[in-house]
């Protein structure tokens, strides 16, 4: 254990898709200071997204310096650094110089679609699902690594000679912060690469062979809570987790059946399944999260495509509201949605339907329907879609949902949170601390060095600000949900398939 007596702070580095952030926490897990810096998004072609890895490192370093200065702290007062990051985004750099050979290919980038189609044609879907827990998609790192090695001249040969290194953003930052001494990732980030066997907890040789990725470029994989190395100023780097898994830990969802939903543009749902890697029959991803001390625990992950974006649509395209915050007021003005259902399948439907041909629709319109009813139906759609995913997770895992922890921008909406509790028939718990992702990284780092000693101590820090209890009778709940399911069924398979046009 490191001596942490005179070091009363932990810094969490939250490296996101559009900005880098640094958040300093004290021993009571209060936020002492925050710094944020946006960076440039590069779109070289339609569907392609890149970041400059050097800019990511520069903004992350600047945020750390700024957060320390704002709190009037010196680096020798920091007990540890925890890192959480945008997942799947891929960097390859030179071992000797630390210079990237290409921009970082971002998780949203679709350039490796053809590589993924070939994997499907080669009949690898079942193998990849069984081994990595993932579906074949350009989202994950494996096909991005192959694309760089295929397209940067001489890079595969250099990789074989051990001259190049691959990493997700956590790995890249640690390499830079330790002055090129440490090449490491954690189990949560490794589980998002499509190259990692989540059962044996090792890089999968067959996937490396299929994608022609030399093993020499891969980082060592470690637990999410341990000392990996030290920054140039001597601070231990002691926690790593991908952003969604960090939020799951920050919410203290460390036991099987505990789940969290992050309400953003879309919604990210993760449910802890403990020591059991559950293979989903409903299109969920099987991924690695963190157990009580940051050790490997499995989780199911599902995404809702349109959450907050549905409210943005009401504001920007339909002009029904001026501000997203107004939705709570309008939705609460009416006693129900007057039979209206809005299915926001603007880009198809995600889990558990996986229907790219579905399109959005409003159902149940009569002359008595007012704007308030439509606004209410839009908010309700977020809660219904969340139930769709959680029902599928419970079916897959056999775990009963104990409660739902929530974070993200939309959790400030009391109407939405209450309706979520009503339609799930379970407690919805909103934390006092909204920085759950950064808090998860801080918790993992703090546990590793003895800054915090036990899970019970952490649970006391993860204070729940408000619990929303279901106030709706079961018969009414199921009637509302049956209406939603009927509406969803009508939106399915709306667009013609490519071969029908």
Curated annotation (Swiss-Prot):
Positions with a binding annotation for sn-glycerol 3-phosphate: 17, 87-88, 139, 243
EC annotation from Swiss-Prot or TrEMBL: 2.7.1.30
Entry keyword set: ATP-binding, Glycerol metabolism, Kinase, Nucleotide-binding, Transferase
InterPro entries: ATPase_NBD, Carb_kinase_FGGY, Carb_kinase_FGGY_CS, FGGY_C, FGGY_N, Glycerol_kin
A GO BP annotation: glycerol-3-phosphate metabolic process
CDD domains, per the entry: FGGY_EcGK_like
List of residues binding ADP: 17, 21, 265, 308, 409, 413
Positions with a binding annotation for glycerol: 87-88, 139, 243-244
Molecular function terms from GO: ATP binding; glycerol kinase activity
Catalytic class of the enzyme: transferase
Catalytic activity from the UniProt record: glycerol + ATP = sn-glycerol 3-phosphate + ADP + H(+)
Regulation of this protein's activity per its record: Inhibited by fructose 1,6-bisphosphate (FBP).
Role played: Key enzyme in the regulation of glycerol uptake and metabolism. Catalyzes the phosphorylation of glycerol to yield sn-glycerol 3-phosphate.
Protein name from the UniProt record: Glycerol kinase
Species of provenance: Pseudomonas savastanoi pv. phaseolicola (strain 1448A / Race 6) (Pseudomonas syringae pv. phaseolicola (strain 1448A / Race 6))
């Amino acid at each position: 254990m490191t001596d942490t007596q005179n070091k009363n702070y932990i810094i969490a580095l939250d490296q996101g898709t559009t900005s880098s952030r640094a958040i300093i926490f004290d021993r009571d897990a209060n936020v002492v200071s925050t710094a944020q810096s946006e960076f440039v998004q590069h779109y070289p072609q339609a569907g392609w997204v890149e970041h400059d890895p050097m800019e990511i490192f520069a903004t992350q370093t600047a945020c750390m310096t700024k957060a320390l200065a704002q709190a009037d702290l010196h680096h020798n007062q920091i007990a540890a650094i925890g890192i959480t990051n945008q997942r799947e985004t891929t960097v390859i750099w030179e071992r000797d110089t630390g210079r990237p050979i290409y921009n970082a290919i971002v998780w949203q980038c679709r350039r490796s679609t053809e590589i993924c189609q070939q994997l499907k044609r080669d009949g690898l879907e079942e193998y990849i699902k069984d081994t990595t827990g993932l579906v074949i998609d350009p989202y994950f790192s494996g096909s991005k690594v192959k694309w760089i090695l295929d397209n940067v001249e001489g890079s595969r040969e250099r990789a074989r000679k051990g001259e190049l290194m691959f990493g997700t953003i956590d790995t890249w930052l640690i390499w830079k912060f330790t002055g090129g001494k440490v090449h490491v990732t954690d189990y949560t980030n490794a589980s998002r690469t499509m190259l990692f066997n989540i059962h044996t907890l090792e890089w999968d040789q067959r996937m490396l062979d299929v994608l022609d990725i030399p093993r020499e470029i891969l980082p060592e994989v470690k637990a999410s809570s341990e000392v990996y190395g030290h920054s140039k100023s001597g601070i231990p780097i002691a926690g790593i987790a991908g952003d969604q898994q960090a939020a799951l830990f920050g919410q203290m969802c460390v036991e099987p059946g505990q789940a969290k939903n992050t309400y953003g543009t879309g919604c990210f749902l993760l449910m802890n399944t403990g020591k059991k890697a559950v293979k989903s029959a409903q299109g969920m991803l099987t991924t690695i999260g963190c157990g009580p001390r940051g050790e490997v625990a499995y989780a199911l992950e599902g995404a809702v495509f349109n959450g907050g974006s549905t409210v943005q649509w009401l504001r920007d395209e339909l002009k029904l509201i001026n501000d997203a915050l107004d939705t709570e007021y309008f939705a609460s003005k009416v006693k129900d949605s007057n039979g209206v259902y809005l299915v926001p399948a603007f880009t198809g439907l995600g889990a558990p339907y996986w229907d790219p041909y579905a399109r959005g629709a409003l159902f149940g319109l009569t002359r008595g329907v007012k704007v308030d009813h439509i606004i209410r139906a839009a908010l309700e759609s977020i809660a219904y879609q969340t139930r769709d995913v959680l029902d599928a997770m419970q079916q897959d895992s056999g775990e009963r949902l104990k409660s739902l922890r929530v974070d993200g921008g939309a959790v400030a909406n009391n109407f939405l949170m209450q309706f979520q509790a009503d339609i799930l028939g379970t407690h919805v718990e909103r934390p006092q601390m909204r920085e759950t992702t950064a808090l998860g990284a801080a918790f993992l780092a703090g546990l590793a060095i003895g800054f915090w000693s036990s899970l019970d101590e952490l649970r006391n820090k993860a204070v729940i600000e408000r619990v929303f209890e279901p106030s709706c009778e079961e018969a009414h709940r199921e009637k509302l949900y049956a209406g939603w399911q009927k509406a969803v069924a009508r939106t399915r398979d709306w667009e013609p398939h490519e071969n029908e046009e």
